[in-house]
Amino acid sequence: MREGFEIVAVNYWKSVNNEIKRILLDFWNTFLLIHDSLDFADIVGFLNKMPNPGKIMYISLTKSNDSMKPHLKDLKSKIFIIDCVSSMIFETKASQDCQFEPTPASLNEMMELIEKYILVVKPDLIVIDSFSQFIDFSSVSMHKGKELHEFLDELKKKYARTPYRFLLLYDNVLSKDLVNLPFTSVDVILKYEILTRRKDRMDRF
């Protein structure tokens, strides 16, 4: 959250393509979360709302491990971070709960990164932060659209019958009109909006 602001409300909009019973029983495989915050604390808040997320493998393309660390104490689940930011800036050293990798340049490279770690980490939930590094849902070219659907189809083909679940974060901080959402390629699409106001603002009512 931006300094000097406080949360006043959290809104949800949901598009569910499979049966609602499946969603309530948490039998989804791919979940697209559209949010308007770059604050990791807000992401932690959402993860804590998920029933039984299990062990999390968090692939970060936008936040360094050091920037996320202060908020991990609030996370209820065990987490393994794959930091794709820090190695571009300074020398890094892996730890028991964090590994450093170059930033994937495409969704194909993202798939390779997932496959590299999924059997080692053995997570229940794989989080990709942020999907907006690969695609802009307000304007999708034919090439990008093809790459997106191939990636999502491959996720389903390989992991639909496994315990692994995928949470795809998409930050829409510019509040663009997202007219090209992959409604038929993911199980759930949820828009997560955090409303804020200045803490020093005086109510005039």
Annotate the PLM regions.
Residues R2-D66:
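Glycine-rich P-loop/Walker A and Walker A-like loops and their local beta1-loop-alpha1 context
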Residues L32, L125-D129, L167:
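Structural motif
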Residues G54-I135:
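Conserved inter-motif catalytic segment of the P-loop NTP-binding fold
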Residues R22-D26, K49-N52, K116-V121, K157-T162, ...:
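Conserved catalytic network of the ASCE P-loop NTPase/AAA+ motor domain
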Residues L38-F40, S64-N65, M88, S132-H143, ...:
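Short acidic, S/G/P-rich loop/turn micro-motifs used as interaction or catalytic elements
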Residues R165-F205:
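Phosphate-binding/switch region of NTP-binding enzymes
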Residues F137-S141, G145-L174:
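Substrate-engagement module of ASCE P-loop NTPases
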Residues I43-K49, P70-H71, L178-L181:
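A short acidic, amphipathic alpha-helical/loop segment
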